[in-house]
């Protein structure tokens, strides 16, 4: 039924053709069941495990690797001789990598799907209905309830469907609907129509929503929606419709993968075509097909070389390390890729209650009457310190500390606060904090009594548990609470009837009243001044109301409560407590005692965090279900708005936002910094508009209602105290519910991205080198310098360790002084691409050169000519060009070992180059990142392991090297540092002359300026070693003449 909240009870009952006392007939139930189906949320049809697994292989690079593995497997099957076993190692290793990557991917996807399932925990098992087949109420399964059913709910019940209340069977009906609307206090319901068809859920006071809890009272109502048509069902539909966006990094890697796969395909085809002329060479037994297969194997090796297999593992490790660092700062990251997305967050949409504020109501101001002269009066105003539920704080008057026991008015005010109250404080030993038991407003009054300590109770030596309610206990010992007149909407107040514990002629029964100031003061006839009772004149009333109005608006927007007493109420026997409409008659002739002003105070550290966000170019938007006045006041307090800023185009209520045209809504989202009185659908809309401006949005939320927006935003942030649905729909959970934690996480995200850029570039330059190596050997006609199983070892293990260590590079000091990076900026710019191409070409040439050195110039080598080496496939005993050459030498493991050792050593040097994008190694020595030094040592140790420990050399087709050969490896490898230092110098001084450059690039640099910041220990250690290395004899020059 649409807009049931606007209709009268009679209209709703007539619509369903049902009688409130008898309920639906079985015939009606059957028809309605057929029309509307079961009252349950359908189980989410998630992807099957097989679908999820197949999805992981949709990536182009993964497909190329899979193809390479299949081809390698087929070729290994037909391999003959000794190599049969080693031939199977390569496809097996590739498949192992792919399986590991797929497992990680499937696990992450599965996590994302749990959010929709978690909604089911809010479905009640049973419901109580009236139907015509039975005279009394009957319990049935909640899933069998249909629209039109008459349902009964009582305290503790979970509401089984969306219900229009028809009658309330208790004084009041309070409902905790925080999971749906985010309201922190329970809501009082009624049966009157709410005439506004566009009312938000918070304002539908005559409705009960499925999944919410009855906090107090008992009621009956008619079901108006079941299953997916309920408010919680609509949230489920919205979540199902929300597709997870890929993170900026995932998009970058997808683009990179596509480009790389095109390049790989081209290079593989090129290598194959270049060598068509060699297909018939004698070494292939003159068989064209064998020759084609041989070069096909080389093309497969190329594909394996070009793909950075280690990249997914290194990225996952780096992000996992990042999540551990974030967890220490109370940010628990649920989805690894979102760690990096945090780094480019440009807008943070934050909830007010509990995130920007403490969600711990506290009294900060109060007043009593000081003097009354005729029609005018003066007030004693006090301020109270302390912004949490901890019972510690001070009371000040005119900025001076005072003792509350010296003011009779304050003693009476504290008495009313303690007795007209059903809440208390509790010390949670596990968390080490004081918590509320009961309503937030009443707990604030309990806490105020503790801070006032009006009877000067000795609090020293009390344990924290005893301290929680010590002062309240003293007051409660003086008087006994007989009964409570519950709060009702018509009088907007509640009261307690108390009798003295020690009866005497002077002490008598009293009624203590608290409530909304305008309602209570209208029923007051006197005011309390000290111990005296003075008639309330219109002048005094005006003065009191003007102060209350002032407190309720402006910067503070305090929630004010008036406190009053009835000095001689009727005897309890004379009072009719059955009918709550009589209560107002007993709360008349009151004496006004004082007023307290309370608020949910901002967290102390939030203002500095918002300042940091402004420096970092991040816009903070407050989104709250609270009213606009309070929201704007808090915004001014914490720095989202400056003190006297005009907010007419920067703060909107949900209603105001809906009334704007689409273009105006879009414009509002571009400038607004505060949205008040919003519903969940508004949050999703705001996220959509922000995404249309290419903003990367972080959205906080804690209720079920926030789940769709959390899922839609790039970074959904749930509160640690929030619902399971919100947590499972989010990417990150704030363990301490604190806004400042988000800012710390953004800073960490930025640092992680910078480090990630470094190691992605490092790994890619390594792959470029491998591709160049294989391309050169094929183009020059040399024997294979590297085989796929060696390439996999380098890509995964020896490169993987330093790449992971680069994730520990220290963050830049000015990381939060820069605007958020553009998520569309390329991972590798044009200049950087040239740099890595240059480095890669050197790596490839050096690797091939090392293999050629063994053939042409090494002492223990065959010392063949360049021609013989480049035409080795024509080597036969009867070929005059190869007289005196044993053709078996071309299958020796030495050249491969030289090539692999040079590749590994160059990569270690390259890791040192990656310590900083543009900073010289002489200024940023290796020990700046001690993890990197350790990783390089470990990688070299693993390389020695495969060289010198049996049977590993057989698997990798390599052999141990002697000292001369190792010296040659170092000679060929070290120049890569010089090459990158030159490229860094060009970048620093000519392409990106920024803060680092001491002198303008045009002027020659003076010696003192050039050597400033140089790490002399590094220079003194490395220079003699380099000079010694290049002075040793390794027949290097014999290669060239």
Swiss-Prot record:
Report keywords, A-Z: ATP-binding, Calcium, Calcium transport, Disulfide bond, Endoplasmic reticulum, Ion transport, Magnesium, Membrane, Metal-binding, Nucleotide-binding, Phosphoprotein, Sarcoplasmic reticulum, Translocase, Transmembrane, Transmembrane helix, Transport
Q: Name one GO biological process term.
A: autophagosome assembly
Record-annotated disulphide pairs: 875-887
Where does it mainly reside?
endoplasmic reticulum
Q: Which residues bind Mg(2+)?
A: 351, 353, 702
Spell out the reaction equation it catalyses: Ca(2+)(in) + ATP + H2O = Ca(2+)(out) + ADP + phosphate + H(+)
Q: Which Pfam families match?
A: Cation_ATPase (PF13246), Cation_ATPase_C (PF00689), Cation_ATPase_N (PF00690), E1-E2_ATPase (PF00122), Hydrolase (PF00702)
**Main EC class of this protein?**
translocase
Output the Gene Ontology terms for molecular function: ATP binding; ATP hydrolysis activity; metal ion binding; P-type calcium transporter activity; P-type calcium transporter activity involved in regulation of cardiac muscle cell membrane potential
Which residues of the sequence carry a binding annotation for ATP? 353, 442, 489, 514, 559, 624-626, 677, 683, 705
Q: In which tissues is it expressed?
A: Only isoform 2 is detected in heart, while both isoforms are expressed in brain, with isoform 2 being predominant.
Subcellular location(s): the record lists:
Endoplasmic reticulum membrane; Sarcoplasmic reticulum membrane
InterPro entries per the UniProt record, alphabetical: ATPase_P-typ_cation-transptr_C, ATPase_P-typ_cation-transptr_N, ATPase_P-typ_cyto_dom_N, ATPase_P-typ_P_site, ATPase_P-typ_TM_dom_sf, ATPase_P-typ_transduc_dom_A_sf, HAD-like_sf, HAD_sf
Q: Where does Ca(2+) 2 bind?
A: 767, 770, 798-799, 907
Spans traversing the lipid bilayer: 49-69, 90-110, 254-273, 296-313, 757-776, 787-807, 828-850, 897-916, 930-948, 964-984
Residues on the membrane's Lumenal side span 70-89, 274-295, 777-786, 851-896, 949-963
Domain topic, free-text comment: Ca(2+) and ATP binding cause major rearrangements of the cytoplasmic and transmembrane domains. According to the E1-E2 model, Ca(2+) binding to the cytosolic domain of the pump in the high-affinity E1 conformation is followed by the ATP-dependent phosphorylation of the active site Asp, giving rise to E1P. A conformational change of the phosphoenzyme gives rise to the low-affinity E2P state that exposes the Ca(2+) ions to the lumenal side and promotes Ca(2+) release. Dephosphorylation of the active site Asp mediates the subsequent return to the E1 conformation.
**What NCBIfam families does UniProt report for this protein, alphabetically?**
ATPase-IIA1_Ca (TIGR01116), ATPase_P-type (TIGR01494)
**Can you name this protein?**
Sarcoplasmic/endoplasmic reticulum calcium ATPase 2
Say which species the protein is native to.
Gallus gallus
């Amino acid at each position: 039924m649409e807009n049931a909240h606007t209709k009268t009870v009679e209209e709703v009952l007539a619509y369903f053709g049902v009688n409130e006392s008898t309920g639906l007939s079985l015939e009606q139930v059957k028809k309605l069941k057929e029309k509307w189906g079961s009252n349950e949320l359908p189980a989410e049809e998630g992807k099957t495990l097989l679908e999820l697994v197949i999805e992981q292989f949709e990536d182009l690079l993964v497909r190329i690797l899979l193809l390479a593995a299949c081809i390698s497997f087929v070729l290994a099957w037909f391999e003959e001789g000794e190599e049969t076993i080693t031939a199977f190692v390569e496809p097996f290793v590739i498949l192992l990598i792919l399986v590991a990557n797929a497992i990680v991917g499937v696990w992450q996807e599965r996590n994302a799907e749990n959010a929709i399932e978690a909604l089911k925990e809010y479905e009640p098992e049973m419901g109580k209905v009236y139907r015509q087949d039975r005279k009394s109420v009957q319990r049935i399964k909640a899933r069998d309830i249909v629209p039109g059913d008459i349902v009964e709910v009582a305290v503790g019940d979970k509401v089984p469907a969306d219900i229009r209340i028809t009658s309330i069977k208790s004084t009041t009906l309070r409902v905790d609907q925080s999971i749906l609307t985010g309201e922190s206090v329970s809501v009082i319901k009624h049966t009157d129509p709410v005439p506004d068809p566009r009312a938000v859920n918070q304002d539908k006071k005559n409705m009960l929503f499925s999944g919410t809890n009855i906090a107090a009272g008992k009621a009956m109502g008619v079901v108006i929606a079941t299953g997916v048509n309920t408010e919680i069902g609509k949230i489920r539909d919205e979540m199902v419709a929300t597709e997870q966006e890929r993170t900026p990094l995932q998009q970058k890697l997808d683009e990179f993968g596509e480009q790389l796969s095109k390049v790989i395909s081209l290079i593989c085809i090129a290598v194959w075509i270049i060598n068509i002329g060699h297909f018939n060479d004698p070494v292939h037994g003159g068989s064209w097909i064998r020759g084609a297969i041989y070069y096909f194997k080389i093309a497969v090796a190329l594909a394996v070389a070009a793909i950075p297999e280690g990249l997914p593992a290194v990225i996952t490790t780096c992000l996992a390390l990042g999540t551990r660092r974030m967890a220490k700062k109370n940010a628990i990251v649920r989805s690894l890729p979102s760690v990096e997305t945090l780094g480019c967050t440009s807008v943070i949409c934050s909830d007010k209650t509990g995130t920007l504020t403490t969600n711990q109501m506290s009294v900060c101001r109060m007043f009593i009457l000081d003097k009354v002269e005729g029609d005018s009066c003066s007030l004693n105003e006090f301020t109270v310190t302390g912004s949490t539920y901890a019972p510690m704080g001070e009371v000040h008057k005119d900025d001076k500390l005072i003792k509350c026991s010296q003011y009779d008015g304050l003693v009476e005010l504290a008495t009313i606060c303690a007795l007209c109250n059903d809440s208390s404080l509790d010390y949670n030993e596990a968390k080490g904090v004081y918590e509320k038991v009961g309503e937030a407003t009443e707990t604030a009054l309990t806490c105020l009594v503790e801070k006032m300590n009006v009877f000067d109770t000795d609090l020293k030596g009390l344990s924290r548990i005893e301290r929680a309610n010590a002062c309240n206990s003293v007051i409660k010992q003086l008087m006994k609470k007989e009964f409570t007149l519950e709060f009702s909407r018509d009088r907007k107040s509640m009261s307690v009837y108390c009798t003295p514990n020690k009866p005497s002629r002077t002490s008598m029964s009293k009624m203590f009243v608290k409530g909304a100031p305008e309602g209570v003061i209208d029923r007051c006839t006197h005011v309390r001044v000290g111990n005296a009772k003075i008639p309330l004149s219109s002048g005094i009333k005006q003065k009191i109301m003007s102060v209350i109005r002032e407190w309720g608006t402006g910067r503070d927007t305090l929630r004010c409560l008036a406190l009053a007493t009835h000095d001689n109420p009727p005897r309890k026997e004379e009072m009719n407590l059955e009918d709550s409409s009589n209560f107002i008659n007993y709360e008349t002739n009151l004496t006004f005692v004082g007023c307290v002003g309370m608020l949910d105070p901002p967290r102390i550290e939030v203002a500095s965090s918002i300042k940091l966000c402004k420096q970092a170019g991040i816009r903070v938007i407050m989104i709250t279900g609270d009213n606009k006045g309070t929201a704007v006041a808090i915004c001014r307090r914490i720095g989202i708005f400056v003190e006297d800023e005009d907010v007419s185009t920067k703060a909107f209520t949900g209603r105001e936002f809906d009334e704007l045209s689409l273009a105006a809504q879009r414009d509002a989202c571009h400038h607004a910094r505060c949205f008040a009185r919003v519903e969940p659908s508004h949050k999703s809309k705001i996220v959509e508009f922000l995404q249309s401006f290419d903003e990367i949005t972080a959205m906080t939320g804690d209720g079920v209602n926030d789940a769709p927006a959390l899922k839609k935003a790039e970074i959904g942030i749930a509160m640690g105290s929030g619902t399971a649905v919100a947590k499972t729909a989010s990417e990150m959970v704030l363990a301490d519910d604190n806004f400042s934690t988000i800012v710390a996480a953004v800073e960490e995200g930025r640092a992680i991205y910078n480090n990630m850029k470094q190691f992605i570039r490092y790994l890619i330059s390594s792959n470029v080198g491998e591709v160049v190596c294989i391309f050169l050997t094929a183009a020059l006609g040399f024997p294979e310098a590297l085989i796929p199983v060696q390439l996999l070892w380098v890509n995964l293990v020896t490169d993987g360790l330093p790449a992971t260590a680069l994730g520990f590079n220290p963050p830049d000091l000015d990381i939060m002084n820069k605007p958020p990076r553009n998520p569309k900026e390329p991972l590798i710019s044009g200049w950087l691409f040239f740099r890595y191409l240059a480095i890669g070409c050197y790596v490839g040439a050096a690797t091939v050169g090392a293999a050629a050195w063994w053939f042409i110039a090494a002492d223990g080598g065959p010392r063949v000519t360049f021609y013989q080496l480049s035409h080795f496939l024509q080597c036969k005993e009867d070929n005059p060009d190869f007289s005196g050459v044993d053709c078996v030498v071309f299958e020796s493991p030495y050249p491969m070992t030289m090539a692999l050792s040079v590749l590994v050593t160059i990569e270690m040097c390259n890791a040192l180059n990656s310590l900083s994008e543009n900073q010289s190694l002489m200024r940023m020595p290796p020990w700046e990142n001690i993890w990197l030094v350790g990783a390089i040592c470990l990688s070299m140790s693993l390389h020695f392991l495969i060289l010198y420990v049996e049977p590993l050399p057989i698997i990798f087709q390599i052999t141990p090297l002697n000292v001369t050969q190792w010296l040659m490896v170092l000679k060929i490898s070290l120049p890569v540092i010089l090459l990158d230092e030159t490229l860094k110098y060009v970048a620093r001084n000519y392409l990106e002359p920024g803060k680092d450059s001491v002198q303008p690039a045009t002027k020659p640099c003076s010696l003192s300026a050039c050597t400033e910041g140089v790490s002399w220990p590094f220079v003194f250690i490395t220079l003699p070693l380099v000079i010694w290395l290049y002075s040793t004899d390794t027949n290097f020059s014999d290669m060239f003449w």
